[in-house]
Amino acid sequence: MRKKMQTGMHKGQEKVMDGKLRNMAGLYLQQGDRMLLLYRIGSKVVSDSYTASAGGHFEKEELNDARACILRELYEETGLTEHDIVNLTLRYVTVRLKNGELRQNYYFFADLKDGQKEIVSNEGNLEWFHIEKLLKNPPEMPFTAQYVIKHYAEIGKNTDMLYAGIATGTGVAFTEMEEF
């Protein structure tokens, strides 16, 4: 049983009640059975681990437009534009309580068009991974990202659903999102 603070809240909840949010978006680029990951270096939030091909925090004017955020991040970090990719789709939205803030991550997937030049990033080192290798021997990744990749490889890549994930201390619980 979790200990409750004197206020009746669980540890960490007192800051969440202030409404602090961190909205982030990530894009996983694919080509065939390979996925491009970024070994991010020098980030204030996620550093020295593998992350999406491109991603970051929402700008004020993007708060209601995750697609605009990810296209901006894609261009800023790799020089690629929407014309260099196909099938850009929001597939996962995750929520995690971390350091007193709710971290909402919007995970997009897209295919890189054939014939693209070598991709470089100003945020770290890009590396292609076979999706099966990611499952068998995953590199160091942010908490929700590792569960998104696992779910995508096992289930998500075979559907066209949007999934919501709630992070717990032991994993991420995913459910299909439906419009109603």
What kind of region is each of these model predictions?
Residues Q31-R34, I41, D111-Q116, I131-K133:
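Short loop segments at secondary-structure junctions
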Residues A66, G79-Q116:
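Active-site segment of metal-dependent pyrophosphate-handling enzymes
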Residues Y28, L37, Y107-F109, W128:
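Conserved hydrophobic/aromatic beta-strand scaffold that supports enzyme active sites
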